[in-house]
Amino acid sequence: MDLWQLLLTLALAGSSDAFSGSEPTAAILSRASWSLQSVNPGLKTNSSKEPKFTKCRSPERETFSCHWTDAVHHGSKSLGPIQLFYTRRNIQGQTQEWKECPDYVSAGENSCYFNSSFTSVWIPYCIKLTSNGDTVDGKCFSVDEIVQPDPPIALNWTLLNVSLTGIHADILVRWEAPPNADIQKGWMVLEYELQYKEVNETKWKMMDPILSTSVPVYSLKVDKEYEVLVRSKRRNSRNYGEFSEVLYVTLPQMNQFTCEEDFYFPWLLIIIFGIFGLTVMLFVFLFSKQQRIKMLILPPVPVPKIKGINPDLLKEGKLEEVNAILAIHDSYKPEFHSDDSWVEFIELDIDEPDEKNEGSDTDRLLSSDHQKSHSNLGVKDGDSGRTSCYEPDILETDFNANNIHEGTSEVAQPQRLKGEADLLCLDQKNQNKSPYHDACPATQQPSVIQAEKNKPQPLPTDGAESTHQAAHIQLSNPSSLANIDFYAQVSDITPAGSVVLSPGQKNKAGMSQCDMHLEMVSLCQEDFIMDNAYFCEADAKKCIPVAPHIKVESHIEPSFNQEDIYITTESLTTTAGRPGTTEHIPGSEMPVPDYTSIHIVQSPQGLILNATALPLPGKEFLSSCGYVSTDQLNKIMP
């Protein structure tokens, strides 16, 4: 092996004389070394022990220096002195000749220093290390790429503040830029990085790069010692320079608390207990105010209350007791005359029959028991301007009472009929000079007595209709035409509430009319019974023919109730075919209106009467049905 190495060295040494300069020799040596290793892998050189470049740096971008390591000697042979050669490329890309290092001393041992005369910032450099003419190491670079500023100088710190607990403190660290860096002219722009740690720790805490020469450091523990370092780099570069000298920061203890461990305020524990306490208080409040809150959210439904009635009766379902209480309670009784502020009542003494013709007829008329006609209800009083005090409710009550006792008073019916006849002729008893007073034959009186003995059934209409028929007979008399203005006097009021009117002067007809009317009514009542709704055919035929046999100067016009009264057309046709009584009346004149309906009460002494519709003779039947109304009946009757 040593022989092969010796032969190779001699060959190389001999060939080196044929080249001028050292560059080809170094290249040949390098290629020869690789060739020997490829031929014999076991043959190795000591290239791994040769010197290497460690770094090249420019502190201020105006000068730069390069450093390398020492060579390691193995065996008896040494490499010889180490030399550095450099070259620069021009703009055209041509490489200049190699030149040796200008200064091996200024930058220190194993270094080469290039001052500003040998430094070009924008021109690339290539350097190499040689030993005994052989190239050991080489590299190429530009000055901009190797800029590494010097460490900052003059580091110090200032205490900013201490926390309220005295555990932490804040400081401000200051320094100065490297003196050889042209910062003021802007030839270089530096960025600084600060790192700190506690003395006994190994991990450094780095802060973000800054452009200023001061930076605050927060939350340093009191009574601890810290190490602070600062380094710089050119902006937009990756290569930091060397760290500055270590700055030691010692914060004195400000209070009695020891700073061995951090004191953390138990915020989480306080929040948990606070929420729990608020929840307990809320539940206590809701429990204590449960009823009040329930009433606010769900107000109770008011229970229906009736004055004077125990609500328990309604709950238990005792409706009989509730109805009994409502019936006897004053506040639930029906109130009459609710719309009238005051009501006048005129008392009528009907217990003294001897005094019936005495006193004011108008006072009797204004009593509360005489009104039944519907034309008088609801008419306003001329004096007070209010509605009449004669209400239909009270009158209907009286009429119902009369209808109820009608069946039980059959014994007193003849006396009542006789009393009505007396009332009709009340104003004619004192007419002694009347030519008709003696005209009433004595043979007619037994008929009246016979009618009283037969106990006739109740008439289909009430006492008012009977009185109406009597009054109509009197008005139909031609002799009473001169006295029609005096039919505003009330002779009497029947127990059933009917009003009996009489002329103001003596009637010339005398008692004959009264007797004949009473006899006619007795005959009609003696033959048939009439109800409140209908007339039968047979009864109508019996009652209607009576009129032609009465030989007086007036005719009796049948008057029927206007409500629900019907008779057959066959009976009316038969009756209408017979000769009427008007044919036998000598000197008949125009019929006189029947003033038996009170229109309005002007004063206690004055009445205004309504005239009923006059019968129109010669009317024919217009209806072809089996029944006709009472209006049509009154028009066609003779």
UniProtKB/Swiss-Prot annotation:
Q: Name one GO cellular component term.
A: cytosol
Stretches with biased composition (Basic and acidic residues): 356-372
Q: Which residues form the signal peptide?
A: 1-18
- Which Pfam families does this UniProt record tie to the protein? EpoR_lig-bind (PF09067), GHBP (PF12772)
Give residue numbers for the modification (Phosphotyrosine): Y487, Y595
Using the record's annotation, list all stretches that form the Fibronectin type-III domain: 151-254
- Tell me where it resides: Cell membrane
InterPro entries registered for this protein in UniProt: FN3_dom, FN3_sf, GHBP, Growth/epo_recpt_lig-bind, Ig-like_fold, Long_hematopoietin_rcpt_CS
Q: Which residues carry this modification: Phosphoserine?
A: S341
What is the protein's membrane topology class?
Single-pass type I membrane protein
Where is the short sequence motif WSXWS motif located?
240-244
Q: What broad class describes the main subcellular location of this protein?
A: membrane
Top-level taxonomic group: Eukaryota
Q: Which family does it belong to?
A: Belongs to the type I cytokine receptor family. Type 1 subfamily.
- Function as written in the Swiss-Prot or TrEMBL entry: Receptor for pituitary gland growth hormone (GH1) involved in regulating postnatal body growth. On ligand binding, couples to the JAK2/STAT5 pathway.
For this entry, the protein name equals Growth hormone receptor
Lineage at the top is: Eukaryota, Metazoa, Chordata, Craniata, Vertebrata
- Gene this protein is translated from: GHR
